Design a protein with these regions (language model features):
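Glycine/proline-rich, positively charged
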Residues: 27, 44, 90-185, 189, ...
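N-terminal small/glycine-rich loop or linker at the start of catalytic domains
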Residues: 8-27, 82-96, 119, 124
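Aromatic-lined glycan-binding groove of carbohydrate-active enzymes
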Residues: 186-224, 259
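Terminal-tail/helix-coil boundary detector
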Residues: 1, 196, 223-251, 255, ...
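Generic structural signal for well-ordered alpha-helices
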Residues: 39, 62, 66, 108-112, ...
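Conserved, mostly hydrophobic/aromatic
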Residues: 6, 18, 35, 50, ...
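Active-site beta-loop-alpha junctions enriched in small/polar residues
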Residues: 21-23, 53-55, 84-88, 125-128, ...
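N-terminal binding-site loop/beta-alpha segment at the start of enzyme catalytic domains
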Residues: 1-79
Length: 332
């Protein structure tokens, strides 16, 4: 497995990581046995970057990782573990963002307990609280680092301008953002700012929520995934149009003799040494396809052919609806 650095000051990690939201039922039923098998596959293939959050399954993802590490103590040294906090609920049970020092530290402490570790390798603010100055939040993260509760700090779904403000206070090791062949908005400043500042760009949904694979989600499968059922790119009309476009990409991947997901991952890795994709899946075969993507080096001609069938801006529909956009920062 190729290695990359998790930010200029961070540890070496596998070029390919894993998004552990898939250890919950978000995209369909997940089992502990299936998740353990995925972790075993990762350990066997040198996939070391493991990304989770306190809100994934209300802590279930972290607890499962903790259980796995408890049964395989030697595995702790094989994984670089990242988690997040900052999304909460008000007294009425409605979703809210909370970047206060008290909330972030309390949630990190709870995450450490679920994971069964004294320190995580990377701690993100999951969503930025707009009313709270980001400089203040960075100071909180720096304090948590000084206390030995995390080795590195980051933000998820922030704008390049916010990253620059944050980096003026302390080094930001990683920024997480959706980035793939069907979501290229990070190229409007975030890819560049991360490279300039020595910040890793951790790309979630690198295979476009299944659309950039050989088994894209079909309309009849949407009922089991409420998040995608209301997502603009999966609404009637947009979904069918997107399926039509990606059929050309699947044909290109087949012509290259590679799984479509592997080519999608390889394309992301070609966008910069600081780009680190973290696909999530409940399937061992799909994980093997992603691992294959980290083994492929695309030529200039390959990249040109991909751009020809999936030109920037090709996707039909926004990546989030109005409710889903609460938290992520829009820019450019």
């Amino acid at each position: 497995m190729r290695q990359r650095r998790l930010g200029k000051n961070g540890p070496e990690v596998s070029a390919l990581g894993y998004g552990a939201m898939s250890f919950t039922d978000f995209y369909g039923p997940a089992s502990d046995a299936g998740s353990f098998a995925l972790l075993d596959l990762m350990a066997e293939n040198g996939v070391t970057h493991l990304d989770t959050s306190n809100v994934y399954g209300s802590g279930r993802s972290e607890a499962l990782i903790g259980s796995y590490l408890a049964t395989r103590p030697s595995a702790r040294d094989k994984f670089v573990i990242a988690t997040k906090a900052g999304i909460s609920k008000d007294s009425d049970g409605k979703r809210k963002l909370d970047n206060s020092a008290a909330h972030l530290e309390a949630e990190l402490d709870a995450s450490l307990k679920r994971l069964g570790v004294d320190c995580v390798d990377l701690f993100y603010v999951h969503r930025r609280e707009e009313a709270r100055p980001i400089e203040q939040v960075v100071e909180t993260l720096a304090t948590l680092k000084a206390k030995g509760k995390t080795r590195a700090i980051g933000f998820s779904e922030i704008a390049p301008s916010s990253l620059r403000r944050a980096a003026a206070v302390d080094h930001i090791d990683a920024v997480q953002s959706e980035y793939s062949l069907w979501t290229r908005s990070p190229e409007l400043g975030l890819v560049q700012a991360c490279a300039e500042l020595g910040t890793a760009l951790v790309a979630f949904s690198p295979v476009g929520r299944s659309m950039l694979t050989d088994t894209p989600l079909r309309p009849e499968g949407l009922d089991r995934i409420p998040f995608l059922k209301v997502n603009p790119r999966f609404l009637p009309g947009n979904h069918e149009a997107n399926l039509k476009v990606i059929a050309r990409f699947r044909a290109l991947a087949a012509d290259m003799g590679e799984p479509t997901a592997a080519v999608s991952i390889a394309w992301l890795l070609a966008q910069g040494e600081h780009v680190l994709p973290i696909p999530g899946t409940r399937s061992l075969d799909h994980m093997r396809e992603a691992i294959r993507g980290a083994e492929i080096t695309l030529s200039t001609e390959d990249l040109q052919r991909i751009d020809a069938v999936l030109p920037i801006g090709w996707a039909h529909g926004d990546r989030y609806d109005a409710v889903q956009w609460v938290g992520p920062e829009r820019y450019c």
